[in-house]
């Protein structure tokens, strides 16, 4: 069920990161070196999860792997134990909670009309549901951390913290950000552009779907205007 995926991505997945933040506070802050394996594996795992996203043909699986890649950045940031990295990790968990939940909601919007999650079969929605295309565009822009969204603020804090800790990490971080932009653009073009393959009449977008997306986008925009509330 799509509701389960939304709750899993927005709340349950982030509880693990929040638990790490709480546990890390009781450990000596000078023992950052003991977390080097975790930082390395989390960054490498984020890159591999992003590469897996490029191979996915199932829309729901693609969004799920996207959540895994973002949590890799969160784990790396928490392990460094600096003020900037912890603030960035907390902000990214909240921002990506809204973003991934919105993407799952949009994926269900497409599934209810096409009864498939295969990307190549869900194309052409720009001509059928133009307002939904706007929601897709905003959600993908948030997913790639476009300014001035809180996603950008959080990823900038994490990137700065990791680069200050070890400049070599910029290689994996840059690769992860690049691949995220590629598959986010791939999602948008695959679902919205091109000729539609639907032969039956498609029902228009419901007000409940627009309300759901509004309740995802507006709070994130408001938090982006005042990010110190969660950092």
Swiss-Prot record:
Catalytic activity: a ubiquinone + NADH + 5 H(+)(in) = a ubiquinol + NAD(+) + 4 H(+)(out)
GO MF annotation list: NADH dehydrogenase (ubiquinone) activity; ubiquinone binding
Predominant place of localization: mitochondrion
Annotated keywords: Electron transport, Membrane, Mitochondrion, NAD, Respiratory chain, Translocase, Transmembrane, Transmembrane helix, Transport, Ubiquinone
Recorded GO CC terms: mitochondrial membrane
Pfam families associated with the record: Proton_antipo_M
The UniProt record lists the keyword Membrane: yes
Entry's EC annotation: 7.1.1.2
Subcellular localization: Mitochondrion membrane
Keyword Mitochondrion: yes
Transmembrane segments: 1-21, 34-54, 62-82, 86-106, 118-138, 169-189, 211-231
An example Gene Ontology biological process: electron transport coupled proton transport
Domain of life of the native organism: Eukaryota
Membrane topology (UniProt): Multi-pass membrane protein
Xref: InterPro entries: NADH_UbQ_OxRdtase, ND/Mrp_TM
Similarity section: Belongs to the complex I subunit 4 family.
Role, per record: Core subunit of the mitochondrial membrane respiratory chain NADH dehydrogenase (Complex I) that is believed to belong to the minimal assembly required for catalysis. Complex I functions in the transfer of electrons from NADH to the respiratory chain. The immediate electron acceptor for the enzyme is believed to be ubiquinone.
Protein name as annotated: NADH-ubiquinone oxidoreductase chain 4
Organism: Causus rhombeatus
């Amino acid at each position: 069920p799509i509701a389960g995926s939304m709750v899993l991505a927005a709340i349950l997945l982030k509880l693990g990161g929040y638990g790490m933040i709480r546990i890390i506070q009781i450990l000596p802050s000078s023992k950052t070196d003991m977390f080097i394996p975790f930082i390395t594996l989390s960054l490498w795992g984020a890159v591999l999860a992003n590469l897996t996203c490029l191979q996915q043909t199932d829309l729901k699986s693609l969004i799920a792997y996207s959540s895994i890649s973002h949590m890799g950045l969160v784990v790396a940031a928490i392990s460094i134990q600096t003020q900037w990295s912890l603030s960035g990790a907390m902000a990214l968990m909240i921002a990506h909670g809204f973003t991934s939940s919105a993407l799952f909601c949009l994926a269900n919007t497409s599934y209810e009309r096409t009864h498939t999650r295969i990307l190549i079969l869900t194309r052409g929605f720009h001509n059928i549901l133009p307002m939904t295309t706007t929601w897709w565009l905003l959600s993908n822009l948030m997913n790639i951390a476009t300014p001035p969204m809180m996603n950008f603020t959080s990823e900038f804090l994490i990137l700065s913290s990791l680069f200050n800790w070890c400049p070599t990490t910029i290689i994996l971080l840059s690769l992860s950000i690049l691949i995220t932009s590629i598959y986010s653009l791939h999602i948008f073009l695959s679902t919205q552009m091109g000729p539609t393959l639907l032969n039956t009449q498609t029902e228009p977008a419901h007000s409940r779907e627009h309300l759901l997306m509004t309740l995802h986008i507006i709070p994130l925009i408001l938090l982006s205007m005042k990010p110190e509330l969660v950092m």
